[in-house]
Amino acid sequence: MSESLIIFSREWLVTTSLTAYLVPVYFRPVTSVYDMTELTRYLRTQPRSPVVLGLRPHEHVTDLYRLQPLLAGRAVLFVSRSFYWTDYSLPEWLGLEQFGFCSWDTIHNPFSRRREMRRFKQSAADVQEDDCATDGAKRQAPAASVITGMQILERANRWLYRELSAAGLNGFEVRVLSLMSEGLKGSLSSRTRSLYKNTGLLKLGMTKHVLNLYRGVKVRPELQAGLHCPDGESRRKVKESGMDEVEILHK
């Protein structure tokens, strides 16, 4: 029997909306998960099940790092309104092999949604074929680690820094982006600094918008959000409103 698609987001409304969108087009069992304990349990008991995560990796580095033993060896799809270079890069650092990204615009469009799910199902099937040598039942849950959340972020940032050069940035662009992401200017003139910043961001697939510099070059402690769903009160209010979850998400 094939294992189900697991859907999870730290926001209950996002989880239910993703479920409403994907159930009609996935054509296989779908399991909606609403808290970290439940997510860990399903990842452990269904080691080959594909996972849809309604989040951006750069905002959940610590939790994803600790979940890495359970996320590795399966297809993972990240869904959000937008992504940054950090988001596209971090799954590789986390040791994920089959992963993808999908915007809400894609999810909202029926044609692109079906196309994305076909692609994702094929990716999941490829993973399951390649994973025959691994006994998923023996895969362990994330162990409590002595490494702190700050140390995890530091490790991620050291890796991201090295990846800037691998992405094609020259030494000046790497230096300028690193300094400016810390709010520093360095000794270059304003015009030269702006030039290297813009060309560096362009090589990373981002525009010169300041938000890309803030979120897209390194991971930050102040942007980290724990993977915990809101309390049952917000969930109850949505049900009592009588509105469809997908409708609310559009508001």
Regions found by a protein language model. Give the residues of each.
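Charged/polar, solvent-exposed surface patches and flexible loops
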Residues: 20, 24, 41, 69, ...
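Phosphate/pyrophosphate-recognition segments in soluble nucleotide-handling domains
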Residues: 132-141, 146-162, 223-237
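N-terminal regulatory/sensing modules of transcriptional regulators
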Residues: 1-144
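Helix-turn-helix DNA-binding segment
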Residues: 146-198, 202-204
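Solvent-exposed, well-ordered amphipathic alpha-helical segments
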Residues: 2-6, 24, 43-51, 74, ...
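Basic, Lys/Arg-enriched C-terminal extension of HTH/homeodomain DNA-binding domains
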Residues: 198-251
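Generic structural signal of hydrophobic/aromatic residues within well-ordered alpha-helices
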Residues: 39, 156, 160, 210-217
